[in-house]
């Protein structure tokens, strides 16, 4: 078989036992030929497994993979360098108990406490070594699970941005767009009422009230005018009030949100009496003008 024309795929070599070498095993394996069993095998101490030669890989068939050794089986045979009278090597059978003992001793030697250099390193018991290994496995699993969750979330977010064509949008902006909490309506802050001295068309907090005083007075004056016993003085007063009302209404340029122009000469007796808006305001005005401070 030519290597350049026909060779095994890379997957079969990666899954084979040649890439799963035991660091603590004392067995050394060299090469296997197609027709024979273990041709060159030797037993060493703490040297691990040796890779087979390239010729054995080239000369073997595609269906035959000699590197798939069953280490977890009950027994396996390894060649012995000690030879008998015959030229053939003798086979030595190693049971699974022997291999487990050697593995345990090598693991315990690696996990010994090196804090006291003066004393000899004592091997740990099997329970301590197993507990130590289990703790390391749990820590690694917890660490990798957290990393996998973070990566999963980031992948989901990236896929969502790609599907919705929002690659430039940040996570906080997406969260604000999809937030289900209703926004509270901003309440309008009502301003406090203030005593404003008006000298023109200035805005005030309160709306202008209707001139009810004018209407009531006009109704009363109409009733008085219908009376037969109305004097000449009342009729002259009525004419003056009507003329003043007409003059005020014609020159009124104010609206409901502004303070009207107040002229003392144009106002009648009822309008000149300005009272405060509340009892509290009246008391404050009385205290202001009566105090000697």
Curated annotation (Swiss-Prot):
Main location: cytoplasm
Polar residues biased stretches: 246-260
Keyword Ligase: no
Keyword terms, alphabetized: Cytoplasm, Nucleus, Repressor, Transcription, Transcription regulation
Domain of life: Eukaryota
GO CC entries: cytoplasm; nucleus
Cellular localisation: Cytoplasm; Nucleus
Region entry Disordered, spans: 239-260
Family, similarity comment: Belongs to the WHI5/NRM1 family.
Subunit composition and interactions: Component of the MBF complex.
Entry function: Negative regulatory component of the MBF complex involved in cell-cycle-dependent transcription.
Name assigned to this protein: Transcription factor NRM1
Annotated organism of origin: Candida glabrata (strain ATCC 2001 / BCRC 20586 / JCM 3761 / NBRC 0622 / NRRL Y-65 / CBS 138) (Yeast)
